Each structure stands twice: as C-alpha cells, then as structure tokens.
Amino acid sequence: MTCSITELAKKLISIPSVSPKDLGCQDIIIKRLCAIGFDIKRVNVNDTKNFWAFRGTGKTLTFAGHTDVVPIGQDKDWQTDPFQPVIRSGYLFGRGSADMKGALAAMITAAERFVNKFPNHKGRLSFLITSDEESSAVDGTIKVVEYLMSKRDMIDYCIVGEPSSTNIVGDVIKNGRRGSITANITIHGIQGHIAYPDLADNPIHKGLPVILKILSIKLDSGNDFFLPSSINIANIHAGNGFNNVIPGSLFVQFNIRFSSEVSEKHIQSQIVNILNSNDINYSIEWLFSGKPFITKKGLLIDTVIQSIFYFNKKKPILSTSGGTSDGRFIALMGSEVVELGLVNNTIHKVNECVKISDLKLLSCMYEDIMKNLLS
C-alpha cells in the first residue's frame, strides 16, 4: 500500500502546478477514479481546473483538495529539485508533498481500497478537486459549490485534506475557521518639500493616530470555538525614499481574522466610523475572503475522532486556528466539514517534505472514515 501511495504522490509532485495551473494532475486522478466506477463532472473556469467525482447515491461523503501549489521561492535554497521528488531517510521531498499532493494520493488510494472491499457501499462517495486554492480561490471550489447548489446537489459530510496536523498525523483536526476580511486604506495628503511643511499636508502624521485607533478596536472576546477577533497590519507604505519629500499618500493594509461573534458589516462600520471621525481624506477598498464557519459535534466529527483514536490511541485536538481554507465554501451548503491532513511543519517552505509512514497512516484513516460512514 505504501508503495502505491508514494508512487502516486511522486507523479503529482513531479508536475509543477503552481497555482492556478493544474498541468495534468487532475487527469491522473480522474483516470484512477474512473477505473473504480466514479462519474466525473469537470467545472473548469478560466485558467482553473476543477472536477466533481461521485460514486453511489444517498448521503454524501466528500473528500476535498487541491492540485495547485505555491511557488518554490529561491531554487538555490532547495536541497533537491522541488519538482523531482526524492525519498531520503523515510521522507518524501518536493513542493506539494505536504500541501497537499500527499493527501490527494492518500485519498485516492483509500478510495481504491474501499471500493474494492465494498463495491456496493451505501451512500455516495465523492471528490471535489480544484487547482485554485493557493492563489485567489475565486475560480476554484466556490465555483463547484455554486454548480452543485444550482442542481440542489448537496454535500452532507466533507473531509478537507489540508495539512491540519502538528506533530503526528491526526493530533489536530480543524472543525472550523475564522473569517477573513482585508481593508486597503489610502490616506491622501499633499506632497511637498519637507522643509516647508506648511505648504504640504503630511498623510503620515494624520494617518498614524488613525492607525493606532483602528488597532485598538476590540471586536469581541471570542467564544468556545474561536479566539478573539484580531486586527493586524499586513502592509504599510509611504514616500519614495527621499528624505526631503513629504509624501502625497499613505497606504496601509489591515487584515482582520474574525470569529462567529461579529459580522463583516460590523467590522467595516467600526473602521469607517474611526476614519470619518478624523480630519482626513481617505479612500478604502474591502476584500472579503470568507465568513467564519464551525462544525459542532455530530456524526462526522465523532467518526473522524473514532478513526484517529483507532490508529493513534489518542483523541485529536479540535481547533479553528490558522488561515482560511476551502472548507469555508463547502460550509455554505450546510455541510459538516472537518479538515484532516498531514503534518504542516514544512508547508510553503523550501525543502517541503512528508514522512512516507505518514502517507500510509493518513490513507488508512481516510479509508476507515469511508468504511464507518458508507459501508
């Protein structure tokens, strides 16, 4: 089994599918799914490749993932070619090994074993795969979700294969994620010579008190599932590097990660009220990434915990920490959503790698979840 998983992972890693490119990864996966009786619906949008695969009827268990990867960074910093996967000391190295081509290989091989053992399984087993998760995420999973909702074709349970684990596979699972919204604020002034400040209007001087007020906003205190919402500066810029020029504008980008205690509209009003209450000329652009979502204890979480405990003899920690994931789109369908994947300590880094034994363990967990929900 390990060889089968590893070989599939290596095939996928060897394809330089930097987001949103797929470059043939999905063709490999689709071929294997077709061989075990899955129907395929491609939902391609612009440069993004998406597909929905399903087998059976009834309550639907979906495995969701992505074939795209982030850029490699500096090639010279890698010990090996990031798109020529190699095995060293029990680890598989390559871009996407942990995030998340290794998990894709674990899913597919788990499905192959499950279907072989239970060809007439109850319910429906499905896959939702995209090549637009790591970049804009506008043409990816959300488009498949919209397609399914237009057909009134709903997902009941979903396992997202994002690398949720911290030290060992299954020690942490994500049963929700915070929402995310970005505010791009430009404070406009009047450029001038720094020796004649009375002839200019310094946007930095006017902007700093406003920035501090925004950072001091307390949106909420969190709840049983989420930490308190946070406001952080992601980027700030003014001036052109000359020490004798007052800049004409100041740009500051805030990112807000928010809990289920507040809405994006409340966040927007809080920030806009501060801007309007100060004597500044500003413009603002909002980028909304997704609402918070939470899956409370139910059949899916109970099943995932049961499978993890079977292999690890220890229950996982339920967490909503970290960034956004495509689970936020699937949750719009009212689905129970849990993220269970590989260890995340090398994701997006140079020399990304995953233990071969972890690939096997994750695939076994996935198969056990299929068996417990569908057999």
From Swiss-Prot:
The keyword Glycoprotein does not apply. It comes from the Bacteria. The active site is at 68, 133 (proton acceptor). The gene is dapE. The keyword Heme does not apply. Homodimer. Zn(2+) 1 binds at residues 66, 99, 162. It catalyses: N-succinyl-(2S,6S)-2,6-diaminopimelate + H2O = (2S,6S)-2,6-diaminopimelate + succinate. The lineage of its organism: Bacteria, Pseudomonadati, Pseudomonadota, Gammaproteobacteria, Enterobacterales. Keywords: Amino-acid biosynthesis, Cobalt, Diaminopimelate biosynthesis, Hydrolase, Lysine biosynthesis, Metal-binding, Zinc. Its cofactor is Zn(2+); Co(2+). InterPro entries: ArgE/DapE_CS (IPR001261), Bact_exopeptidase_dim_dom (IPR036264), DapE_proteobac (IPR005941), Peptidase_M20 (IPR002933), Peptidase_M20_dimer (IPR011650), Peptidase_M20A (IPR050072). Its EC number is 3.5.1.18. Pfam families: M20_dimer, Peptidase_M20. It is an enzyme of class 3 (hydrolase). Zn(2+) 2 binds at residues 99, 134, 348. Catalyzes the hydrolysis of N-succinyl-L,L-diaminopimelic acid (SDAP), forming succinate and LL-2,6-diaminopimelate (DAP), an intermediate involved in the bacterial biosynthesis of lysine and meso-diaminopimelic acid, an essential component of bacterial cell walls. This is Succinyl-diaminopimelate desuccinylase. Transmembrane segments: none annotated. Binds 2 Zn(2+) or Co(2+) ions per subunit. One of its GO terms (biological process) is L-arginine biosynthetic process. Pathway: Amino-acid biosynthesis; L-lysine biosynthesis via DAP pathway; LL-2,6-diaminopimelate from (S)-tetrahydrodipicolinate (succinylase route): step 3/3. GO terms for molecular function: acetylornithine deacetylase activity; cobalt ion binding; succinyl-diaminopimelate desuccinylase activity; zinc ion binding. Belongs to the peptidase M20A family. DapE subfamily.
